[in-house]
Amino acid sequence: MITISEAAQAHFVKLLADQPEGTNIRVFVISPGTAQAECGVSYCPPDAVEDDDIELEFNGFNAMVDEKSAPFLEDASIDLVTDQLGSQLTLKAPNAKMRKVSADASLVERIEYVIQAEINPQLASHGGNILLVEVTDDGVAVIQFGGGCNGCSMVDVTLKDGIEKQLLDMFPGELTEVRDATEHQHGSHSYQ
């Protein structure tokens, strides 16, 4: 469920040494499954452990995860990153905003998952996003660009060389094309 690097585990052990005995850590997601989802790590004293918590054992401490957050922390990782400015813990949870779908989920659900988990985070750096409108019977994924992507002069390159290539590689034999249904209007919102 959650991977914690050796460096991060050693850091947690050091931090927990200054806490009352029996204190562990809690990894959680606030507003899981939404665009506003935020992940966090906090101390978890023994009296804060809930009956339905999932307890994960690590080297020198345990991590508690509440039942509601658990599916959104699949494939999450915690690391201690050190650079010239010092060190900091990083928590990456690719499924926090949208629950990972099973391999036997519908094509639409699997495409929507990839859009939310992988494509939209990339487009967000330019203030953009895409929305899946439909998947036609002949395997065409129809998408709509929003935010900074609407009216952007590079939208065709983003569509063909980025989004379409990624989706066709991920869904061979199921998708044949990705088509843009956006009525593009260049404006101050558009990424240049």
Curated annotation (Swiss-Prot):
Family note: Belongs to the NfuA family.
Keyword set includes Iron-sulfur: yes
InterPro entries: Fe/S_biogenesis_protein_NfuA, FeS_biogenesis, FSCA_dom_sf, HesB-like_dom_sf, NIF_FeS_clus_asmbl_NifU_C
Cofactor note: Binds 1 [4Fe-4S] cluster per subunit. The cluster is presumably bound at the interface of two monomers.
Gene that this sequence comes from: nfuA
Pfam families referenced in this protein's UniProt entry, alphabetically: Fe-S_biosyn, NifU
Chain positions recorded as [4Fe-4S] cluster binding sites: C149, C152
Name the record gives this protein: Fe/S biogenesis protein NfuA
Cofactors (names): [4Fe-4S] cluster
Function noted in UniProt: Involved in iron-sulfur cluster biogenesis. Binds a 4Fe-4S cluster, can transfer this cluster to apoproteins, and thereby intervenes in the maturation of Fe/S proteins. Could also act as a scaffold/chaperone for damaged Fe/S proteins.
SUPFAM superfamilies registered for this protein in UniProt: Fe-S cluster assembly (FSCA) domain-like, HesB-like domain
UniProt GO MF annotations: 4 iron, 4 sulfur cluster binding; iron ion binding
A GO BP annotation: protein maturation
Keywords from the named record: 4Fe-4S, Iron, Iron-sulfur, Metal-binding
Subunit structure: Homodimer.
Coiled coil: none
HAMAP family in alphabetical order: Fe_S_biogen_NfuA
